[in-house]
Amino acid sequence: MNLSEELDSIYQEAIQKIGSSISEEDLDKNKNDFIGKKGKLTAVLKNVALLSIEEKKTIGQKANELSKKLENFVVETKSSLKKKLFETQAASEFFDSLRPLPNASNGSLHPITQIQYEIEDIFTSMGFSIMDGPEIETDTNNFGALNFTDDHPAREMQDTFYLENGNLLRTHTSAIQVRTLRKLKPPFRIIAPGRVFRYEEVDASHEHTFYQIEGMVVGKDISAANLIDTMQVLLSRIFEKEIKTRLRPGYFPFVEPGFELDINCLVCEGKGCPVCKQSGWLELLPCGLIHPNVLSHAGLDPKEWTGFAFGLGLDRLVMMRYGIHDIRYFQSGNLRFLKQF
């Protein structure tokens, strides 16, 4: 028997053996017997080196073709074995569709999501629309169009997550303010909830990822009195009780004048704690009248249109409502904590 005939004989034997495999373990054994490192077909291939150049070409090509055919046949056989096993198990198993399910705990909304929906309801009842925007933003939308100077500290890499293409993870939902000013014709009232990112040192009151709701009203003769009234309505409906607040001057490039609305810390009731950094007060709501440069950048005449804007931190709002002393709980995924809400 020459080498070519020997290859044909081995191939036929392999087809018979592999095809008669009764399990995946049996299949693996039969495969190794023929095309494994010490298999019969592999042993023949080792003798090809002893042949003439012409025979090497012919026998080598034939051996490789048969080896590939056997590899494919092994795959087909394995698939067939799996199918037969499934059919056998399916035929022997019985599923009672009327059987009562075991008790399973129901899921629930995250406390931040709950308060977001609640705030959305409050503002939509006052005629506000809800807007959305991408979490990956351009430098222009996040900074430039909001009147941030090129050398503003917030643009630096220690405060902002920049991407390789020059875009960034938005640092505030104010970026949606820019998109809205371009998209809508005034007058309008909008809120824009979303997740924001800052390169923060994480502690009890700071996270690198947190949630805000941006609010903006644009119309004619909008004043600080309209802003303060809107904030008072919001806080009274959120906390359902009298909340001690203070309004102090604050600087934000996109508003003029700018204010900081602080509330008396509800975690320590104003006595001082890590959440309020022992001050008894917590910065909750930076706000102000929209800067004329922001309106001009969007193509609006600041002599004709005015407005106010605010940014509300949802994480801190939830902390105040429930007396939570550490903002890191929200991102922890701890079900013992989350199931309380």
Swiss-Prot record:
Listed cofactors: Mg(2+)
Reactions catalysed, as given in the entry: tRNA(Phe) + L-phenylalanine + ATP = L-phenylalanyl-tRNA(Phe) + AMP + diphosphate + H(+)
Gene3D superfamilies, sorted: Bira Bifunctional Protein, Domain 2 (3.30.930.10)
Domain of life: Bacteria
Amino acids binding Mg(2+): 256
EC number: 6.1.1.20
Keywords for this protein: Aminoacyl-tRNA synthetase, ATP-binding, Cytoplasm, Ligase, Magnesium, Metal-binding, Nucleotide-binding, Protein biosynthesis
GO biological process, one term: phenylalanyl-tRNA aminoacylation
Cellular location(s): Cytoplasm
Any GO molecular function: ATP binding
PROSITE patterns tied to this protein: AA_TRNA_LIGASE_II
Record SUPFAM superfamilies: Class II aaRS and biotin synthetases, tRNA-binding arm
UniProt feature coiled coil, ranges: none
Gene Ontology CC terms: cytoplasm
Family that this chain belongs to: Belongs to the class-II aminoacyl-tRNA synthetase family. Phe-tRNA synthetase alpha subunit type 1 subfamily.
Subunit structure: Tetramer of two alpha and two beta subunits.
Listed NCBIfam families: pheS (TIGR00468)
Protein name (record): Phenylalanine--tRNA ligase alpha subunit
Organism the protein comes from: Leptospira borgpetersenii serovar Hardjo-bovis (strain JB197)
Phylogenetic placement of the source organism: Bacteria, Pseudomonadati, Spirochaetota, Spirochaetia, Leptospirales
Chain's gene name: pheS
